[in-house]
Curated annotation (Swiss-Prot):
PANTHER family: LIPOPROTEIN SIGNAL PEPTIDASE. This is Lipoprotein signal peptidase. The gene is lspA. Pfam families: Peptidase_A8. It comes from Neisseria gonorrhoeae (strain ATCC 700825 / FA 1090). The active site is at 122, 140. Pathway: Protein modification; lipoprotein biosynthesis (signal peptide cleavage).
Length: 164
């Protein structure tokens, strides 16, 4: 195995870890909660719950007729394929590759939900008084943190390329 391939193994392990952690956490919630049941963890701030999201992040397009399930499925697969290719071609520095792997893992976790359940399982609910942040899951967290890392990588490399 070439050193280039073996050096990328850590990114595939990270993506796989994101998928496993996401699916395990969803299995635990699905096994323990009834739909819309809430258990307070931190008073007036954080609950565990079980809700279904047929749309995208923050229930975007959730009230549509069902076409969005396939749209987001295809979108997640296409973005993941692009990111896999980018990692393999060394189009990112290390921080960008970590971010890409996190996005791939998170997107894959939500794709698995769409294929198995027809919707994404969300269970983390943060709120303050009467303001509620939309429920989300571990996969969403990996996607968001991964996106931030990819953007930071892009900013750093833009500055580096201007120096040369």
């Amino acid at each position: 195995m070439s050193s280039s391939v073996s050096s990328k193994t850590r990114y595939w392990v990270l993506a796989l870890a994101a998928i496993v952690l996401d699916q395990w956490s969803k299995w635990a919630v699905l096994s323990s909660f009834q739909y819309r049941e809430r258990v307070n963890v931190i008073p007036s701030f954080f609950d565990l719950t079980l809700v279904y999201n047929p749309g995208a992040a923050f229930s975007f397009l959730a009230d549509q007729g069902g076409w969005q399930k396939y749209f987001f499925l295809v979108l997640a697969v296409a973005v993941s394929a692009y990111l896999v290719r980018a990692i393999l071609r060394d189009e990112f520095a290390a921080l960008g590759k970590i971010g890409a792997a996190m996005i791939i893992g998170g997107a894959s976790g939500n794709v698995i939900d769409r294929l198995i359940h027809g919707h994404v399982v969300d269970f983390l609910l943060f709120y303050w008084q009467n303001w509620f942040y939309p429920a989300f899951n571990i996969a969403d967290s990996f996607i968001c943190v991964g996106a931030v890392l990819a953007v930071l990588d892009n900013i750093v490399h833009r500055k580096d390329s201007k120096k040369t």
